[in-house]
Regions:
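Canonical positions in the second alpha-helix
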Residues: 25, 64, 99-100, 133-134, ...
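Register position in tetratricopeptide repeats
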Residues: 9-11, 50, 86, 120, ...
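Helix-start (N-cap) detector for alpha-helical repeat units in TPR-like alpha-solenoids
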Residues: 33-34, 38, 72-75, 108-109, ...
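Structural marker of alpha-solenoid helical repeat scaffolds
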Residues: 28, 32, 67-69, 103, ...
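Residue-level recognition of tetratricopeptide repeat
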Residues: 5-7, 46, 82, 116, ...
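Terminal, low-structured helical/coil segments at or just beyond the last alpha-helical repeat
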Residues: 159-185
Length: 185
């Protein structure tokens, strides 16, 4: 592990070499994997995500979950959801973000993330429900208004889409103006 940390400090280091060293640190823990091994697994997850190795990162998230006996915070499920989403596992991502919501129902970002999964699944009515929950918690969440507008466009509700995009723009969303020009003219 210390060799991996030292390797990170070398200019122009190879991330693959760091992952290999972390693999060895985890292997050294053998069958007695514990909190120490869990820390190494978390480190390896971060590097795998940097290399867009989402499937491997998901496997490491699962290993980490097992190593610590499932004692995780809601943010764990959010982070694993992000990897699953990027890997194209939308059902797995949805289950994880819903676990995050269950653990922290007052976090608007989790509802927004749930909505974005529903949009990818073309479940626009479900997405709108999630968006409404996020906005109820954080009324100035501009990205949610943008997402509401996208759902309304897909549902052929042009007036509602314009209103949502306009609210997003008013709240400073950087993409809202472009979406208004693209979908509401």
């Amino acid at each position: 592990y210390l060799a991996a940390k030292a390797k990170e400090r070398v200019t122009g280091f190879n991330i693959g070499d760091v992952i290999d060293l972390l693999d060895k640190a985890i292997e050294k823990c053998g069958t007695n994997m514990n909190a120490e091994a869990a820390a190494y697994v978390l480190e390896r997850i971060n590097w795998r995500l940097r290399l867009a190795q989402y499937t491997e990162a998901i496997a490491d998230y699962d290993l980490y979950y097992t190593l610590i006996g499932g004692q995780v915070l809601p943010n764990f499920f959010f982070l694993r959801e992000q990897a699953k989403f990027r890997a194209g596992d939308l059902e797995g991502a949805l289950k994880d973000i819903q676990a995050a919501i269950q653990g922290s129902p007052s976090t608007p970002d989790y509802y927004a993330e749930e909505a974005s999964i529903y949009v990818r699944q073309q479940k626009y009515e479900d997405a709108l429900k999630s968006i409404e929950r996020a906005i109820a918690i954080a009324p100035d969440f501009g990205a949610c208004y943008r997402l509401r507008g996208v759902c309304c466009v897909r549902l052929k509700k042009k007036t509602e889409a314009f209103e949502a995009f306009n609210k997003a723009k008013e709240l400073g969303d950087p993409l809202a103006g472009k979406l208004i020009k693209e979908h509401c003219k």
